[in-house]
Amino acid sequence: MAHLKNLPWELIEEILSRVPPKSLVRFRTVSKQWNALFDDKTFINNHKMTFRFILATKSKIYSVSIDPVIVVRELPLGIPGLESLELNNLVDCNELLVCVKNNGAVVWNPWLGQSRWIQPSLNHSPMVFDGIVYDNKKYKMVAFSGLWKIYDFSSDVWIDHKSKSTNSNTNVINVQTAVCLNGNLYWVCFREKTDPLCYHIHKFGFSNSIWVRFCNLPFGRNHDGDALVLGVFRGDRFSLLKQCMVTKKIEVFVTENKINHENGDDVVWKNFMTFSSPNLPDLVETVKFSNPSYFIEGKRLVVCSRDNTGHAWIYILGDSKLISKTRIECVVDPWPLHCTFVPSLVPVPAPCRREEQAELQV
């Protein structure tokens, strides 16, 4: 690759942005500059990788992309922990995917072909895996099993965590609304289920491991059956989707500026999309009351949800109307789990070697 030294760095970045994620891994050893580039948030956001949906049935996992037509691809499952699926949940951790099972979880980067099995704590209570927090390539898993627990990826150890919060009476609506943004976890919380003024976002950070009230929401749920889903917009801000159970009206709000993780007081929400046409689908099925998954692509809203028979659908909305709806026919098993995911270059964190752990303890 000596001839590449004569190319402008901007051109090298453009070339590399078109290389598939799995192929980029081998180029980390070319130079320190290249290795640093693959960890750079701007490069990752500009890389030709777009949002897609991950769907998991009892026997298979699929990637569903929209570029520009819907493409369904079955993902290989020859990795430890996923030989037999039987998943309880899929958790999108921004850069990694967590596949939750009864007896633990698999942290997985499907595009790099890397995975790691996370054994649950010795407590025999079922664990709810909420997501991953990180800082400077150090990672922790946040879970709940009667009390909050923190798993350290480096030491491979679970720690019971005494919950600290600025408002201990705040309840989490749904653990699936947890969102990972730049290393922190955020939840939609409420004081009264059907009081829109009581809804806000709680944050759990890596450094202090404390739950704090972060910012208010522009609206809440008026009915128990309303869809209310927090998401990530443009890689550094929030989005919030709501669908009214009664009118079927869909609203999407986004934050105007990048999220300042130290202070949520300056968060300003604005209406980004509104859909109120009569043919809008029900995004929350009435059988299992599961929230939809969604992402924003340009001026389009792309949603994945299940109908009342358990079949998966992709809805594309834009220009104040429903543009298309497509049933994913090849996903045969009903009631698939689903979440959004962006193919990433982030490796699955490995445990420290014994020598490194000894140095950390010193």
Swiss-Prot record:
It comes from the Eukaryota. NCBIfam families: F_box_assoc_1. Signal peptide: none annotated. SUPFAM superfamilies: F-box domain (SSF81383), Quinoprotein alcohol dehydrogenase-like (SSF50998). This is F-box protein At2g14710. Pfam families: F-box, FBA_1. InterPro entries: F-box-assoc_dom_typ1, F-box-assoc_interact_dom, F-box-like_dom_sf, F-box_dom, Quinoprotein_ADH-like_sf, SCF_F-box_component. It comes from Arabidopsis thaliana. Residues 1-47 form the F-box domain.
